[in-house]
A protein has these predicted regions:
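Dinucleotide-binding Rossmann-like beta1-alpha1 core, especially the glycine-rich loop
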Residues: 48-129, 227, 246, 251
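N-terminal Rossmann-like FAD-binding beta1-loop-alpha1 element of flavoenzymes
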Residues: 7-32
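Active-site substrate-recognition segment that forms the wall
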Residues: 22-26, 51, 82-87, 188-282
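Helical element adjacent to the flavin cofactor pocket in flavoenzyme catalytic cores
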Residues: 143-174
Length: 338
């Protein structure tokens, strides 16, 4: 069936579902997005807007790179009145042990082979990148200056929503949707419609300060071993997640910074912290389980699902991240989860 005559229903008006709807409509499909609460009402409404190409698996490197290229001119693509404000602050991944540094070396080698300008840095250079960073107990780290974040990521979600035919309706059964194809992109709620998929809620909390005039933390700093990530936004607010004690131990200048504002959300996590993409059965497709990196990959995922549904194309990501991998023992663990 051609794209011009195909009717597609998308369940979920988060950034992934809306991106899929955008790419389907761009290729001539008739698309309706069903959402039970509101545009960006789930994880897409609270995500901090980070975009990076530093990953430990080939599939994520490719999805992130394509998405970053798409985002480069997102304001023109979506006819946005508001500038979403991309800031290339850089991402610094810290390694506290030789084992963690060895994993970062493997990841950087993979990234470099795919055109990502990341590199391993010694503790002395980490101290230059992040003034006042305590490096005595660091083995090194990985750095990419081109990674960054959007000041207003929700503006992108809203712009995608404005271009879509979004209907507030709770889909209780896929049988009620009479479209030629159905895509379930409902994040943590996906198992309500596809209970066979191993997606579970993983609570996350973001803490924010009031605006601070002084720039205390310029790049985004991540410590997977100590369980935290932090950055300072363009408006001066400090944004942090995870272990505050570990954060101030590594960055003593932040010890007196209060973080009175809390934003609670959930990751739609899978056993390997990778998305589930592809056909589930007959006319039913899924794009969920992004484990916190849906915004970073949404543009590429939209293109891949649209081409698969309308043109029968099978992207590499559909082979790697297919729903059957869990039952078949083909998990693809991602080592660089924040």
């Amino acid at each position: 069936m051609s794209g011009e005559s195909k009717d597609v229903a998308v369940v979920g008006a988060g950034v992934v579902g809306l991106s899929i709807a955008f790419h389907l409509a761009e290729r001539g499909a008739s698309v309706v997005v069903y959402e039970r609460t509101g545009i960006g009402a789930g994880a897409s409404g609270v995500q901090p807007g980070g975009v990076r190409r530093q990953w430990g698996t080939r599939v994520n490197c490719l999805l992130a790179a394509e998405s970053l290229r798409w985002y480069a001119d997102v304001r023109e693509r979506l006819r946005m009145r508001v500038d979403p404000g991309f800031r290339a602050c850089g991402y610094l991944f810290l390694a506290h042990s030789e084992g963690a540094l060895a994993q970062l070396r493997r990841s950087v080698e993979l990234q470099n082979g795919l055109g990502v300008p990341s590199r391993i840095v010694a503790p002395a250079e980490e101290a230059e990148l992040v003034p006042d960073l305590r490096t005595e107990d660091l083995a090194g780290g990985a750095w990419c200056a081109e990674d960054g974040y959007f000041d207003r990521p929700q503006a992108i979600v809203e712009a995608l929503g404005a271009l879509a035919d979004v209907r507030l309706h709770e889909v209780r059964s896929l049988a009620e949707l009479e479209a030629d194809a159905v895509v379930v992109a409902a994040g943590v709620d996906t198992p309500r419609l596809l209970p066979e998929l191993p997606i579970r809620p993983e609570p996350r909390v973001l803490e924010l300060s009031d605006p601070i005039r002084e720039r205390l933390l310029e790049p985004l700093v991540v410590s997977a071993e100590h369980g935290f990530a932090a950055k300072q936004l363009a408006d001066g607010r400090l944004l942090a997640s995870g272990d505050r004690a570990a954060l101030v131990d590594l960055l003593p200048r932040l010890v007196h910074v209060a973080l009175p504002h809390r934003v609670e959300g959930v990751y739609d996590a899978t056993p390997d912290h990778q998305a589930i993409l592809g056909r589930v059965r007959d006319r039913v497709w899924v794009a969920a389980g992004f484990s916190g990196h849906g915004f970073m990959q949404a543009p590429a995922v939209g293109r891949i699902l649209a081409e698969a549904i309308l043109e029968g194309r099978e992207d590499e990501a559909l082979r790697v991240l297919d729903p059957a991998r869990f039952a078949e023992g083909r998990l693809v663990p991602e080592p660089q989860i924040v």
